[in-house]
Amino acid sequence: FKRLRSDKKKEDLAMSAAPADEGDDVAITHPERVVFAKKKLSKGDVADYYRQMARWILPEISERPLSLLRCPDGVGKACFFQKHHGQGLGDAVHAVPLQQKSGREDYVYIDDERGLLQLVQMNTLELHPWGATVADPEHPDRLVFDLDPGEGVSWADVKRGARDVRDRLQETGLQSFVRLSGGKGVHVVVPL
C-alpha cells in the first residue's frame, strides 16, 4: 500500500484478478484412482505434483519430442510407452512430423503446463524428452548419460558413477548437470 487515490472514485476502481495458471482448466477425471499403490498416491496427487513442478519440468521437456510412459491402471499393472501422437491426447498436446525409416510419423510434444496436465490426464507418469528440439530434430543440443542401476547396485554406487561421468566430461571441457530420471537412476546431461 502506498496511498489512497484522490483522482478516482472508489466506484470506478476494481480489483484485478490474479492470472490463472495455464493448466487450471484441465479436468482430471478419476482423481481418486490410486496409481502408486505402495505410496498410496492417486492420479489427483500426480496432477498436483506436476502443477507444482511445471516451472522446473517444462524447460527440460518443452518443444522436444517425447516418449511417454502411460499407466492407465497404475504402476505395477499394464503400462506402455507411446511416442506417436494420437486422438484424444488433448488440444495442447501437439504433433510434429518426423522422418523415420518407414516414412514420416507424428511424434508427441508439448509447450506449456496445459499440455503437461493433459498428458497426466491421459495417465502419463513419465516423460522422456529427446536430446533435440522439434525445431531442429536432426541436430541434438544435449547428450544424456542414463545411469540406470541394475539389481544390487546401491544409490552410493549410482552417485559415484555420476560423479565419474561428470569428471571425465570436465576433462574434455564439457560441463554437465544431473537430474533424476524418474526411476531409480540419474541422467547426466551435457548441453552441446
Q: Where are the model-predicted features located?
A:
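Signature for HUH/AEP ssDNA processing cores
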Residues: 108-181, 192
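Long, charged low-complexity interaction segments
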Residues: 18-26, 31, 168, 174
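Short, well-ordered alpha-helical packing segments
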Residues: 47, 54, 58, 159-162, ...
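Short, conserved secondary-structure transition motifs
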Residues: 76-77, 189-192
